[in-house]
């Protein structure tokens, strides 16, 4: 496995390619674009992503832990597939923050998102089924077509949510 620690990656673009066997620790990604990319047997720990775009990724054996995303467009990411079951059960998340991100059609199935702040995110078409969302904030979010089946949404933080036609299951 090739390792990168504390490196900066800027404006890297990959479409329809495969990234395999890479370890990224405390790396910074700025302005990077991944479209229809297969990411296999990679690990991202403590990385920061700024102004990046990821569309329709395919993950196989990928682990992500405690990463930060700022002003990113992350479409079709299955966040629940980026952690092993043991870490999920312990309440770990692949991300620490999703600041001002577009998260259209993302999957957050079964994640412990208690108290997480999604404020101002575009969550159109996202799936939050089976999550712990107690005290999570969805203030000023776009929620059109978002699914919240089998969740505890109390107390709901949906103040100012836009296009709030969403499904509670």
Where are these regions (language model features)?
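Tandem repeat scaffolds
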Residues: 1-169
